[in-house]
Amino acid sequence: MGKSTESLIYDMAFRVRLYMASKISEQKVGDLTDRESLIIELVGMKGSMSISEIGSLYPTVSNSTISTTITKLWKDKKLVDKNILPENQRVTTVTLTEKGKQILEEIKHTQADVFSTISVSLGLSPDQTEYFHEILKNAIIFFDETMWLKLNNTKL
């Protein structure tokens, strides 16, 4: 028998991370760090997130680091707006500015190119593609439930 499912998932995830890192760094979008790009993507998908919601998705990163990153995206790069909720002034929400939305589109375009290359290289038949989509949907549901990440535009 070949490798275990767990081992294959690890091998694939490692290679995807390496491939994405090399391709994304070649096409650096908006001079963003990986963390900044991910925050832009999260806020873009959710529409609006509190700083604590964003921080909860980074359990190994301190709240002050997340807050500093968001402040940099707000003050220095003008990619997000920070808003204090009138009904609870202890909560600050983050939304994308128009410039942030443009950068998000660039990020998506760059990633679409990378993922398209991967998808085409698999050479799946229509039946294999349908089955593969079901596997991917199940993985997405797992991560959404594990990380409480209910994204607005995820249609499975």
Describe each region flagged by the PLM.
Residues 41-42, 105, 133:
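A cross-family signal for key residues in well-ordered alpha-helices
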Residues 21-65:
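N-terminal helix-turn-helix DNA-binding core of bacterial DNA-binding proteins
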Residues 6, 98-117:
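Conserved segment of winged-helix/HTH DNA-binding domains
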Residues 30-36, 97, 122-127:
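Short helix-coil-helix linker/hinge
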Residues 13, 17, 104, 140-144:
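A structural signal for well-ordered alpha-helices, especially hydrophobic packing surfaces
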Residues 109-156:
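Terminal interaction helix/tail motif
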Residues 47-92, 98:
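Canonical helix-turn-helix DNA-binding module
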Residues 1-31:
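N-terminal leader segment of winged-helix/HTH proteins
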